[in-house]
Amino acid sequence: MIREDEPAIIFMDEDARRLHHSHDDAIVITLAIANYTTRRVLIDNESSADILFYPTFHKMRINKELLHLTNVPLIGFGGTKVLLVGTISFLVMVGSYPRQINKEVNFLVVNYSSSYNAIIRWPTLNSLRATTSTYHLSVKLPTKYGIEEVQGDQLAARECYLAMLVVNEQMQTMNIEERRTLAKQIKVLEDVSLVESNPGKFTKIGSSMREKTK
């Protein structure tokens, strides 16, 4: 419940003066996750799951056996199927002393190549009573010591975006090469009769096979 004496969260023009305009950048911030300073954390108001990418988890040097295995599929991340390694709960610290909030967050750990280290979803933002502004690249949330602002890193957001474009382009190129290889294989198939007296019975084999093998 919001107290009547709690200050309102507002965004002003001066909050955006530090940014380069105009922009369509995402909100990318730094959080303390499991006591590790974690940069390149994407704030996603549309994501339904808190994501921690496995390379980041690995760098934390946390025992993999602490992960809880789950059968929940994650089949639509960035339009690509991803491998769900497991789930784990970490304490996340938002803000800086004294206006900081500690929150236990349950992460899905996924094995996927990403320029981000983690993604924070909208239910977690709601539990923090956080308000975001994509124009100001800012997250503000109430604390008992006043309103805390976590500013987005515009440069990091642009670097992550460009890096993801490269990854997506590489994946598309791989898919195109796979289709070309498959098409080439189909073209070199030829009909071979199984029974000489019955031309209707035949199979398809590669035309590059040796005559004796045929």
Regions found by a protein language model. Name each.
Residues M1-K214:
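Short linear "hotspot" motifs
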